[in-house]
Amino acid sequence: MWLLLIRKYLCIVILLLCIGNKNTDTLITDSLSIYDNHPTLEISEAKYLQWVDSLLGVKDVKLIDYRNGIYQYDDTRFYWNRTFDYFLVYPSSFTHGEESDLGNGNHFVNEDSTICLNVYATYFDVFKDDYSLREWFDMMIDSEVEQGNRIIKKDITDHSYTIEGNTKSGRCFYSKAICKKAYGREIIVTVKLEYMNFIKKQAEKIISMNINHFLYNPLE
């Protein structure tokens, strides 16, 4: 029994590390520099964008920030995490942050920092021998409570969950996690929106248009 408790504690620690060692209130004021100077590519930027166009099935995708996975097509600004192969469309007026050291996610804020959007991925297949997906989801939700957040609404399906509530600092939040395969491995991608209550309508629009349609090619 003690071994199981220790294992569960270690897994929760791993989850918290994947989320990041900063809370969201810090993220919305820290590390928000825009890295528009692309690092040297192994091929020319033009050839790289030709490859992106062919992969996404469109023409004229613009590279905004290679280092942090930011692209634009027409008026659509999106984050493409190449390490875990997922996408997130976000409002073009938002400022993007620096991709995490683990290369698993990024964060985005509006001009006055009243809305913060976080996305990150974790490997699930390494824990399959010890936990079912439902048990892992339960642990992820428990980790929110252990951070001091209050959950007021919860919906769990076979391959995803959605929770809503309030953070310890009094913000509202909406979080969605989905299990998917990336390069033959099972991963869980989590997107979390935190916002002040007085801009709830704008947040609901982001939930409807961006969060509920994330993960896959946004240009299809």
Question: Where in the sequence are the language-model features?
Answer:
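Hydrophobic h-region of N-terminal signal peptides that target proteins for export
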Residues: 11-21
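N-terminal targeting sequences that direct proteins away from the cytosol to non-cytosolic compartments
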Residues: 2, 19-115, 123, 145-146, ...
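Short, solvent-exposed recognition patches
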Residues: 119-149
